[in-house]
């Protein structure tokens, strides 16, 4: 009985060093492919947040105009925040994300700019000049500015 157990323990084998190294190499290759992909996702998310935020600010600017007989002259970051409390202004919110970095108004139009978080740094701007609306993106880092700088 004891001899059988000894024989069985000699017959059992584990993984060889080569097999373990191949598995580690495969895991390393997969990580090298996946990690850069995941890191870029934060930049894309911050860009999407900035685009959504500048659209919200645009709606607030239109509300300000409606309240002021069609004039956009009082459009400022603080005025946008007074209309929509969820609009962060002036600096990046705690925990990261986008914020309204600039907002100016004239009688017949306005310009509102949102800056994506530090991982992207891109700025997204909506300008309304006498009813003609343009959207532009300025590259501040990596992320989602299209080639023609319009979004």
Regions from the language model: what does each represent?
Residues 12, 44-48, 52, 94-100, ...:
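Residues at secondary-structure transition points
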Residues 22, 34, 44-45, 61:
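Hydrophobic side chains within alpha-helical segments
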Residues 59-151:
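Periplasmic/extracellular, small/polar-rich flexible segments of pilin-like filament-forming proteins
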Residues 11-38:
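N-terminal single-pass transmembrane signal-anchor helix
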Residues 37-54, 68:
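Aliphatic-rich helix starts adjacent to a transmembrane/signal segment
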Residues 1-15:
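N-terminal leader/signal peptides at the extreme start of proteins
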């Amino acid at each position: 009985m004891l001899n059988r157990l000894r024989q069985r323990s000699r017959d059992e084998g584990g993984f060889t060093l080569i097999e373990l190294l191949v598995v580690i190499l495969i895991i390393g290759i997969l990580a090298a492919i996946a990690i850069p992909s995941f890191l870029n996702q934060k930049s894309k998310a911050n860009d999407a947040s900035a685009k959504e935020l500048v659209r919200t600010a645009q709606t607030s600017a239109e509300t300000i105009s409606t309240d002021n007989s069609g004039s956009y002259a009082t459009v400022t970051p603080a005025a946008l925040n007074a209309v929509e409390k969820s609009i962060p202004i002036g600096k990046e919110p705690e925990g990261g994300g986008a914020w309204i970095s600039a907002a100016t108004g004239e009688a017949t139009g306005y310009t509102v700019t949102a800056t994506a978080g530090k991982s992207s740094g891109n700025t997204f701007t909506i300008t309304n000049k006498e009813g003609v609306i343009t959207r532009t993106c300025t590259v501040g880092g990596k992320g989602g500015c299209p080639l023609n700088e319009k979004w």
